[in-house]
Amino acid sequence: MKKKGLYQIKDSDKKVKEYTLSVLTEDKAGLLNSITIIFNRRKINIDSLNVSTTEVKGVSRFTIVVSSTKEKIIKVVNHINKLIDVLGAFLYEEDEIYYQEIALYKLSTKIFLKGDLIEKIIIRKYGAKILKIEKDHTIIQKTGTKVGTQKLYDELKKFGEILEFARSGRVALSKKKRKTINFLRTLEKTKSNKLNI
């Protein structure tokens, strides 16, 4: 039986672009490995990966960002949909989702003694905030897109060395009016076994 969410390949799908996959799964150990192996076999690098719980108990959401051709990524999505503990895999382009990432920047506290210019850049221009100030370092937090967090990184680099930098994986929700629980109930009706929802 075919699951919902299977995609067809068109001739126009050969250009490399950024795609976001949202994969709903049962909360089972070992599934991360099963999913990442599919990308490895097709030589597709995962740019960002986030796994979290959903609003439905026992269901996890994998948010995976890749740069690939649509042709290749459709094959990956179709393969992921065939995994036993996968409830549904969905493919999105950037304009089809709401998404955010978080970035943390560790800077020497000394650069803040040079005046308020850096604080104006951080707070006013980039909407970042100072998370923690210690004697030897200061932590800045920025939530936004990868482009936005990278622009702040480049700007901060001009003031001195960035001691440490970390960026989270993307979290994303579809712009479509689909509720996870409704999708799972529809899926449950087509399956012989009951889902624990």
Predicted features by range, described:
Residues 1-20, 24-59, 70-197:
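Long, contiguous binding/interaction regions
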Residues 64-67:
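Amphipathic, charged alpha-helical scaffolds that flank and support histidine-based chemistry
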